[in-house]
Amino acid sequence: MTEYSGAGDPKRTLELLWGVRERPRRGPKPRLTAEEIVRAAIRLADAEGLDGLSIRRIAEELGVSPMSIYTYVPGKAELVDVMVDRAFGELAPPGHGSWRARLEHIARDNWALFHRHPWLLQITTVRPPLGPNTCAKFEYELRAVDGLGLGDVEMDSVVALVTGFAESAARVSVNAAEAERRSGMTDEQWWEASAPLLETLVNEDDYPLGTRVGAAVGNEYGSAVAPGRAFEFGLARVLDGIEALVSSR
C-alpha cells in the first residue's frame, strides 16, 4: 500500500513539522508529547510497516486512548509527513571532499536510511514534507554541487538523480530481503527448486543470450540479483555521467 506525503491538512501538518501548538496551553501537564507519538509511530513502522499503522495501534503502544493521540495529531496523513521528516534528520551532511565524494556520501547515506526504515519506500514524496529536516537535507544536497558551473535547475536535477537512484536501488534490495522472508527460501534455494522443471520447459537455443548471461550472473552472485553490487555499479555510472556534465562546463 502506497502512502502519499502531503495528503493531510497543510496547515496542521506544518504546525506539527515545526513544533507549533506542541501541547494545550492550559490545564494539567499532558501525559504525551507530539515527539513521543512520532517516535512510537516510527518504532511500529520499523517493526510492522505502514499497512498496520493506525492511531489506535499507536495508542495501544503508548498505553493511552486514541483520543489522547488526536489531541496532538489530527490523523495518520499528517503523522506520516512528520515521520518522514524525522527520519531525514538521521542523515548527515557530506564533508568537505570533492563533489564526487560528497554525492557518493549522499547516495550511501540515503541507501542506508531506506534499509533502516523500509517503510519510507512505501511513501511517495512528490509533495515533500516541508519540515526542518527535509529543508536541511535539500540545502546540503545542493551545497554538494554548488560552484560546479551548473545552473540552478541542473543542480536540482543532479540531486534528484542521485537520491532517486539511491531510493530505487534500495527498493530492489529491501524487496529482495522481503521476498526471502515471506517465502522462507533464499534466492539460491528458489532457483534450485525451479531449475529441474524450467530446464524441460525452456529451450536454451531460443534464448542464447539470456542463458549465457543468466548462467554467468548465477555463478557470480549465487542468485539472479545482487542488490548491493548493483548499487555499487549503478552509483559509479551515475557519478560518471555527472562528471561528464560537469566537465562540459
Protein language model features and the residues they cover:
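Hydrophobic alpha-helical bundle segments that form small-molecule/ligand-binding pockets
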Residues: 137-165, 169-196, 242-246
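A structured, mid-to-C-terminal "fold-capping" secondary-structure block
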Residues: 2-3, 185-249
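Amphipathic alpha-helical segments used for helix-helix packing
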Residues: 84, 111-133, 140, 171, ...
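Helix-turn-helix
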Residues: 36, 40, 44, 48-77
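N-terminal intrinsically disordered/low-complexity leader segments
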Residues: 1-31, 208-218
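Alpha-helical structural segments
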Residues: 36-43, 78-93, 105-112, 136-143
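Hydrophobic alpha-helical connector segments
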Residues: 92-136, 152-155, 159-162
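Amphipathic alpha-helical interaction segments
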Residues: 36, 57, 78, 105, ...
